[in-house]
Amino acid sequence: MPMNIVNMFGKYIKIIKWIGIASLIGIVGGLSSVIIAIIIEYFPEKHNVLLIPIVFFIAGLFVDYIYELKGSGIDRVLKALNTNEKLTWIRGLLKVLLAGAVIAVGGSAGKEGPCVQSSASFADELYRLLKLKNRELVIITGIAGGLGGAFSAPLGTAILACEIIEHENFNYINLIPPIIASVVGYLIFYLITGRKHLFNITLSYTINIHDFLLFILGAFFCSLIAHCYIKTYRKISSTFDNLKIPYCIKTLIGGILVAVISYFIPEVMGMGLTLTKELFIMEFSLVFLVLLLIGKILATSFTVGSGTPGGLVFPSMCIGAISGIIFGSLIGDCSAPYIVLGIATTLSATTNAPLGGAVLCTEIFGFDFAVPASIGAVIGYQMTKLETIFKYIRF
């Protein structure tokens, strides 16, 4: 009996310890998202085509001196985990500041990557400071904290963080710290900014059995586009990596190309959240949607692929939304379910995280969209399995 009490007390202490650690990590993730939101909100020259190359060049100067600031934040964390490199929080914070300026000026990148690197770097510092044992779980918790603050969807982002690292070895026991970190990250962002949802729109959809086959066809269609997007990004990224020139010149070239695209198609600028929201409530011609799709894929590839600090998940969701509405236009039905289908398909395809993709989209858009989200996530994962947008993802 006394031994049982001791064991139970030990479990309570362990749970309390992890709640405390995860909460601290979540606070950093939420604050990172707040910082980027403030930079974007108060940047003096938002979406200025002429400033894009200049800001990209300045960001590249930092990358030349601090390599960890390069490109995708999630990829940087994955590389550090795979190679046992140390992550430092001050560099993660610097990436948040640079990415905020890049997005504000019009770079096609997401805020989730820098937020993830910031919170995961802080988590890694805690891992070393407190001499914790399971570094992988600590890093997963860091990823979840950053995603929770960025997406305002704590459950889906916690699952997404676990799947990105563990894949088929996903263990539900490891969900506890990531969920805590993700919830705290979301709460911090909400309490400071007042923004409760990623998309402040009300959507409704009545499930129809006749849509089932169309959802399957649409998921295959969006998977094909996601595959092309992954190939395009990887090719452009490797091309920039192979250039034997300073990163500031690489990012300058990327900035010039993004500026040219943005001049003709200004809708591709930024994270893509505003554009995704507009797809739900506005009508666009099929020709313009195709141009928008190509422009967003290229703008994202030239932004993050050139080494400019930023994230890939938000632009991927936007590309998925465009893919979904293009399919809807082709069949004569541009309703919201096909946009959600496209987002779930592309999100799952680019991250190889079907469960996280399905839950995240259902959490963001509502339970009415669980069917297209689930179908899209499963098919997107199967169609592009072992091919992701992240270079250092581990299988």
UniProtKB/Swiss-Prot annotation:
GO terms for cellular component: chloride channel complex; plasma membrane. It is a multi-pass membrane protein. It is found in: Cell membrane. GO terms for molecular function: chloride channel activity. It comes from the Archaea. Pfam families: Voltage_CLC (PF00654). The keyword Methyltransferase does not apply. Belongs to the chloride channel (TC 2.A.49) family. This is Uncharacterized protein MJ0305. It comes from Methanocaldococcus jannaschii (strain ATCC 43067 / DSM 2661 / JAL-1 / JCM 10045 / NBRC 100440) (Methanococcus jannaschii).
